[in-house]
């Protein structure tokens, strides 16, 4: 039951009765996995735990990655300081290479000032906003940790790296891990500090304007500051850097359109979602988190689904340029808002589009224009 799962002593007593153990021998327990089963009127919290019988834990709650010094090592240019770029830089350090991260936006703290101006003054800095800047689009729009991709890679390692840099170890446990917009900036700063302390570089307000191509080989980048950076290049530019994709297209780089999803963001009272999901007119009570939902259906043979559900959160203006109307959702770590929201989108397939591989970018641009 939720109230038992929330109290360590109650949990020890429950396990002792269930397994026939003297609870005095249970010196500690560690929750390894946690999920909520709300399919029936009686709500259960499913836990996987590790017991320490007549011993105290000696192991850490997360696995640390060793990052060695890379001064003087071959350098690799990483364009973009969102999650893709930051994790690419950390991985390069593991491989004994020196990352040089180039980010068009500002550092995560200065970026917050520009984001506040969007709501307060209705002014959008096209280089520093909800999409551009250290931490990428997720830094100030929720910090949810999940992937729909079937090519998942080592998700556990990613979560452990986040914990190593200050995220709560609850992300290793919860079925739907979430750091929270209020906690994530500090984690991102710590990741940047690791990169710099190991001998890497991070350059803010430095936009890649073009790739340097010599003898049909990429050898570096040119930036808006006039400075060039030489070395192999990793593009981690995210979904809003349309100028990058236009440059690649104009310079003959082979590109293929991918499907996208287009829709709206819905907002509901958190209490309403809690009442529905937890089958209780009084809502979630003291021991349950703000309720989530996931919606998937087919309409005329086309997928329609909810996306980026933010329980106990806010709808935020997420334009990355002037004359745009774009929104996103976010939740603080406690998910304590009286409102919940979710995207509701329909898939658009490549075959729906023109032969132009940039047509999805053009469609997004037109959809976001304020008219």
Model-predicted regions and their roles:
Residues 1-45, 49-140, 144-371:
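Residues forming the flavin
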């Amino acid at each position: 039951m939720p109230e038992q799962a929330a109290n360590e002593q109650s949990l020890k007593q429950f396990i002792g009765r269930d397994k026939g153990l003297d609870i005095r021998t249970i010196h500690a327990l560690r929750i390894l996995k946690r999920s909520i089963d709300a399919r029936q009127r009686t709500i259960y919290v499913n836990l996987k735990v590790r017991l320490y019988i007549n011993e105290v834990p000696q192991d850490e709650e997360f696995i640390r990655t060793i990052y060695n010094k890379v001064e003087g090592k071959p350098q690799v240019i990483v364009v973009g300081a969102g999650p893709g770029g930051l994790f690419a830089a950390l991985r390069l350090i593991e491989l004994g290479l020196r990352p040089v991260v180039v980010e068009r936006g500002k550092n995560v703290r200065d970026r917050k000032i520009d984001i506040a101006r969007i709501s307060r003054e209705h002014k959008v800095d096209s280089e520093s906003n909800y999409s551009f800047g250290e931490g990428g689009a997720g830094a100030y729009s929720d910090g949810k940790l999940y992937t729909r991709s079937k090519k998942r890679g080592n998700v556990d390692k990613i979560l452990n790296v986040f914990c190593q840099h200050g995220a709560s170890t609850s992300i290793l446990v919860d079925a739907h891990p979430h750091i929270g917009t209020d906690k994530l900036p500090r984690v991102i700063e710590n990741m940047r500090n690791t990169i710099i302390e190991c001998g890497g570089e991070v350059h803010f307000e430095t936009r890649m304007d073009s790739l340097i191509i010599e003898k049909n080989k990429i050898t570096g980048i040119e930036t808006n500051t006039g400075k060039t950076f030489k070395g192999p290049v990793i593009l981690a530019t995210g979904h809003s850097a349309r100028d990058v994709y236009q440059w690649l297209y104009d310079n003959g780089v082979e590109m293929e359109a991918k499907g996208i999803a287009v829709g709206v963001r819905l907002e509901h009272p958190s209490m309403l979602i809690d009442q529905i999901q937890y089958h209780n007119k009084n809502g979630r009570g003291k021991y349950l988190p703000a309720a989530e939902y996931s919606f998937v259906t087919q309409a005329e043979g086309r997928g329609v689904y909810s996306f980026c559900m933010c329980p106990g959160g806010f709808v935020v203006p997420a334009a990355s340029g002037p004359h745009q109307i774009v929104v996103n959702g976010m939740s603080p770590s406690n998910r304590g808002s009286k409102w919940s929201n979710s995207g509701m989108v329909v898939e658009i397939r490549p075959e729906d589009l023109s032969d132009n591989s940039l047509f999805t970018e053009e469609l997004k641009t037109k959809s976001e224009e304020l008219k």
